[in-house]
């Protein structure tokens, strides 16, 4: 491991949706930089924690449930006080507006947007006491695109940008930052199978 980039030594980071894809890559990068990393997902992300090694800690978390967040805020203290929260968990079913039902709309908002509020509710108080913290929300560059069948997803991801801007202002005097990151289409298992030609064309 390259110790020259261990800029997060002594910090504890929490990454949601860390079983695979972007979340797993972020968790591994934070660990490489010296952080203790709490990795969460709907199913226990054992593989990610194992790849990290002794500084990786796996917890099961449904980001839509406030009780799960409350429980995690207590259990995570065994690892340490959380300094960095990376909200990466996402839900993105393709539905045309004609086929979009309220249950799908609400699940999309709960997963993609409510989770950011809940993480702040339960981890912001500790950051304020320590006068240091980082919130990172994984949004999407799709907020600036017109994609058929994704109105609910785009709305939720635009909401992340707005929430992070507001949160950043609320915590600016406490040594805490809040930022949204808008990645483009990323070659992960979540986007489904791709032919080699498709991969070359897109990625």
Regions found by a protein language model. Give the residues of each.
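Active-site helix of classical SDR
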Residues: 120, 156, 164
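Residue(s) in the substrate-gating loop at a strand-loop-helix junction
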Residues: 140
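Active-site loop immediately N-terminal to the catalytic Tyr-X3-Lys motif
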Residues: 98, 145-151, 173-174
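Substrate-binding pocket helix/loop in short-chain dehydrogenase/reductase
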Residues: 96-97, 104-109, 191, 199-203
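Conserved glycine-rich cofactor-binding loop
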Residues: 12, 19-20
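Alpha-helical segment proximal to the catalytic Tyr-Lys
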Residues: 125, 169-170
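Catalytic Tyr-X3-Lys loop
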Residues: 91, 98-117, 132, 136, ...
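Short, flexible catalytic-loop segment of classical short-chain dehydrogenase/reductase
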Residues: 144, 182-193
């Amino acid at each position: 491991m390259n110790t020259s980039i261990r800029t997060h030594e002594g910090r504890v980071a929490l990454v949601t949706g860390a079983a695979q894809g972007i979340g797993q890559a972020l968790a591994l990068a934070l660990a490489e930089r010296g952080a203790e990393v709490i990795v969460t997902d709907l199913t226990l992300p054992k593989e990610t924690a194992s790849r990290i090694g002794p500084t990786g800690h796996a917890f099961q978390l449904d980001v839509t449930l406030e009780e799960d967040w409350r429980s995690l805020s207590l259990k995570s203290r065994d690892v340490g006080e959380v300094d960095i929260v990376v909200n990466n968990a996402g839900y993105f079913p393709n539905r045309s507006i004609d086929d979009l039902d309220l249950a799908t709309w609400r699940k999309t908002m709960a997963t993609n947007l409510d989770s950011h509020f809940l993480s702040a509710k339960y981890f912001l108080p500790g950051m304020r006491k320590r006068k240091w913290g980082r919130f990172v929300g994984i949004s999407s560059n799709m907020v600036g695109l017109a994609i058929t069948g994704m109105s609910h997803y785009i709305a939720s991801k635009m909401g992340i940008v707005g929430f992070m801007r507001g949160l950043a202002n609320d915590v600016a005097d406490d040594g805490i930052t809040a930022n949204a990151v808008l990645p483009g289409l990323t070659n992960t298992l979540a986007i489904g199978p791709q032919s080699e030609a498709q991969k070359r064309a897109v990625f």
